A protein has these predicted regions:
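A short, structured loop/turn motif at beta-sheet edges
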Residues: 14-15, 42-45, 68-73, 91-100
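Hydrophobic ligand-binding cavity/cleft-lining segments
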Residues: 1-45, 137, 148-149
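Hydrophobic/aromatic beta-strand elements that line small-molecule binding cavities or substrate pockets
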Residues: 6-8, 39, 63-69, 87-94, ...
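Helix-adjacent hinge/juxtasegments
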Residues: 59-71, 76-79
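Beta-strand/loop substructures that line and gate deep hydrophobic ligand-binding cavities in soluble
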Residues: 79-133, 149
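Short beta-strand segments that buttress and anchor functional surface loops
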Residues: 50-56, 75-82
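Short, cysteine-centered beta-strand-loop-beta hairpins and adjacent loop/turn segments enriched
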Residues: 55-61, 109-113
């Protein structure tokens, strides 16, 4: 299993950051390698079930995410199934009038087990870069003058 974790401070209220991230269609607009994120249903816990298509190192991976822990304006924990398997955790923490948003993921490195020791470090670096870009894109989108209101 591989775990990556990054955070960013955003000059926007927690509610706005959480609402934006809670919309599955927004994920493909801020995540470079995510080509599709489609809402399948809203769950009884308030979270979502969504379908994803992710491109990693020239390969296409698809599956579903399901919000298994959903606390509005605080956190969403996703279980990821399909070609990629693991857990994604989002935390939104208020800091005065801003939000500290944390993205953490734990997942299996795809591919045959005997290659994972070789591909693991490459996949880790790729995903660390992907998450940093996602967080920068989220910050830019929510702090832009067009995002006000």
């Amino acid at each position: 299993m591989l775990t990556v974790r990054e955070h960013i401070d955003i000059s926007a209220p927690v509610e706005r950051v959480f609402d934006y991230m809670d919309t599955p269609a927004h994920q493909a607009t801020i995540t470079p390698s995510l080509s599709e994120s489609v809402l399948l249903e809203r769950l009884p816990n308030g979270g979502s079930r969504a379908r994803y298509t992710y491109r990693l190192l020239g390969l296409s991976f698809s599956g579903e995410v399901r919000a298994t822990d959903y606390v509005p304006n605080e956190r969403i924990v996703w279980t990821m199934t399909g070609d990629l398997q693991g857990t994604i955790r989002w935390y939104a923490e208020p800091i005065e009038t801003r939000c500290r948003f944390t993205y953490a993921a734990t997942y299996r490195v795809p591919g045959p087990r005997f290659l994972q020791s070789l591909t693991g470090p490459l996949v880790r670096r790729y995903n660390e870069r992907e998450i940093r870009t996602l967080l920068r894109n989220l910050k830019e989108r929510l702090e832009s003058p067009r995002a006000a209101g």
